[in-house]
Regions:
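Rossmann-like NAD(P)(H) cofactor-binding subdomain of soluble oxidoreductases
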Residues: 88-154
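Glycine-rich Rossmann-fold phosphate-binding loop(s) that bind the pyrophosphate
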Residues: 12-13
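C-terminal substrate-binding/catalytic lobe of Rossmann-fold NAD(P)-dependent dehydrogenases
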Residues: 134-140, 150-314
Length: 314
């Protein structure tokens, strides 16, 4: 029987630990279990984060093992080699697929029946690997995808327009990586098309400005890694938001990575497209309006991911 207030984090690196810290403050769970190959690391992180519980809400945070996944509502997998300066996310494929081959079968052995959230990179590839290795229904295996990329885009647009980023509605779709696509055609600020809002705010070089913003968003992870060796706060907040949507059955629309079938002539590959997300995971895709150029770039992104999947032996 699933404990609807229990989450498990697999791997206590920068991303995993920051995500647990964010989840501790969310009030979503009363039990959070940390699993790591280094048991001392898991115990230390659990102790440290637990000391913040008096400032949050009552819960248990502790180091555990794979038996703890059996009744968990959500298992978050952040395990994987980190991205180094100069590396792309796709450079991590072989190393992190090997790690997933050791982790996912352990989860499957426990008859896990909750939602699996993949956060490790390359997230689109690893989400599809997790589906194949776990045997779980596709709707219950979700990748963090371009949730963070889209948040970065909204932040940059809000900064550019001097408006609250929460009023900006814009998605990055496709790969969480170098072939990502900004869906400019559907971008708006509280219902006002982005190009119109730019002019209203005194910005008349719309194409040049949006191109600069898209480049800044795409390169932001590389820039952060070059400066501080890892990114973890932004993705931790993304993990918290995805967990909120699932645990509260919000049916919110998020650009998470999931298996795509028949949207924009794409089939049989995991990538990010806006989807309705709730207690059962992915409910349905939302095929947002794209220009011909955007649809072509999305197809190219999907094809590049497919080619990589074809090289992986599972």
């Amino acid at each position: 029987m699933i404990n609807s207030k229990k989450a498990v984090m697999i791997c206590c690196g920068f991303v995993g630990s920051a995500s647990v810290f964010a989840l501790m403050q969310s009030g979503l769970f009363t039990e959070i279990v940390l699993i790591d190959a280094d048991k001392n690391k898991a115990e230390g992180e659990a102790m440290d984060i637990s000391h913040g519980i008096p400032f949050a809400s009552p819960m248990k945070i502790y180091a555990g093992d794979y038996d703890d996944v059996a009744d968990a509502a959500i298992v978050v997998i952040s395990a994987g080699a980190g991205q180094k300066p100069g590396e792309t996310r796709l450079d991590l494929v072989n190393k992190n697929v090997a790690i997933f081959k050791s982790i996912i079968p352990e989860i499957a052995k426990r008859n896990f029946a909750g939602i699996m959230l993949v956060v490790a990179n390359p997230v689109d590839i690893l989400t599809q690997v997790a589906i194949k290795l776990s045997g779980l229904p596709e709707n219950r295996v979700i990748g963090s995808g371009t949730v963070l990329d889209s948040a970065r885009l909204r932040y940059k647009l809000g900064e550019h327009l001097s408006v609250d980023s929460r009023s900006v509605h814009a998605f990055i779709i496709g790969e969480h990586g170098d072939s990502e696509v900004v869906a400019w055609s559907s971008a708006n600020v509280s219902g006002v098309p982005l190009s119109e809002m730019c002019e209203m705010r005194g910005h008349y070089k719309h194409k040049e400005n949006t191109a600069e913003i898209a480049t800044a968003v795409k390169n932001s992870a590389y820039e952060i890694i070059n400066k501080k060796h890892a990114t973890y706060y932004g993705i931790a907040m993304s993990v918290k938001r995805i967990c909120e949507v699932i645990m509260r059955d919000e049916k919110s629309i998020l650009p998470v990575s999931h298996m795509i079938h028949g949207v924009y002539d794409i089939d049989g590959v995991s990538l990010s497209m806006p989807a309705i997300v709730g207690a059962d995971g992915i409910e349905s895709d939302i095929p947002i309006n794209l220009s011909g150029e955007e649809a072509l770039k999305l197809k190219e992104s999907a094809d590049s991911l497919k080619k990589i999947m074809e090289t992986i032996e599972l």
